[in-house]
Amino acid sequence: MNAKAYFAQARSLPMQIQAKTKQLQAVRALQEPLAALPEASKTLSDLAADITAEVQAYAALQRQLQTLIDSLPVPEYRTLLELRYLSGSKWEEIAEAMSMHVRWVYRMHGRALQAAQKILDAAK
């Protein structure tokens, strides 16, 4: 997996967890009318287990990404990737926090991903 796809997981997993949580809330709202059906209880517990597993996977991914980010040689790369992928900041917020123009943040992001890719390749 390349560095860009690896980091992209950090932005997509929370959305998946949020979608499943909404689904769980919808099922819980229907739970009382469906209480007589044994399948409803099983569906609810299966959904809760799925959410728990995804939250655990997300936490593990966050730890892996933090380790990778910490190994980058340039402090600005570390800051940028932490803001983008661990804090979920938007490009404009990152540019403001780092006192840079957004276009420069995009360029630096590409360079940071290249540096991260070198570390990932060396670890193989």
Residue ranges and their predicted role:
Residues 1-71, 93, 114, 118-124:
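N-terminal interaction/assembly modules
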Residues 5, 89, 107:
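Short, well-structured alpha-helical interface segments that form or flank functional binding sites
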Residues 61-64, 75-77, 108:
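N-terminal positioning helix adjacent to the helix-turn-helix/winged-helix DNA-binding module
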Residues 72-89:
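Short amphipathic alpha helix immediately N-terminal
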Residues 87-103:
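Helix-turn-helix DNA-binding module
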Residues 99-119:
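DNA-recognition helix of helix-turn-helix
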